[in-house]
């Protein structure tokens, strides 16, 4: 069963809203090292979205998603420092994963996400792993949440 990692989902939602991610962390960490105080920091997307109430529902049959693997060579000579300069790359991905993501609209950030997805607007185009595996995001609507006892 392939589970959609919550932090990965927050990263995708943060990309839609234009929040900074892990690439900003290198700058933050190097600045803190220079100042002599290294404390824990999180990317902007996580700081802003960590409190969202989210449900992730797998839609593939029994939650099983097939995995594809591709192996290719990069033999330009400078790709690898090993003798011969041949870099063997093994890439793997999930084939046609499907999840239904439910977000409780109880805060401003959740409402921003709803508006962005509903209006097909995003700051950074979301993708799953590599930029040739774009996320196909559909807005399904708003439903009333009910408490179950």
Language-model features and meaning:
Residues 1-22:
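N-terminal ordered "arm"
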Residues 27-41:
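Intrinsically disordered, low-complexity domain-flanking/linker segments in eukaryotic proteins
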Residues 3, 29-30, 49:
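Domain-level signal for Mg2+-assisted phosphodiester chemistry and nucleotide/NA-binding surfaces
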Residues 18-23, 41-45:
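Compact, well-ordered interaction domains used in eukaryotic information-processing assemblies
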Residues 21-26, 110:
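Short, solvent-exposed secondary-structure capping/transition elements
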Residues 38-42, 46-149:
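Internal, well-folded beta-alpha domain core
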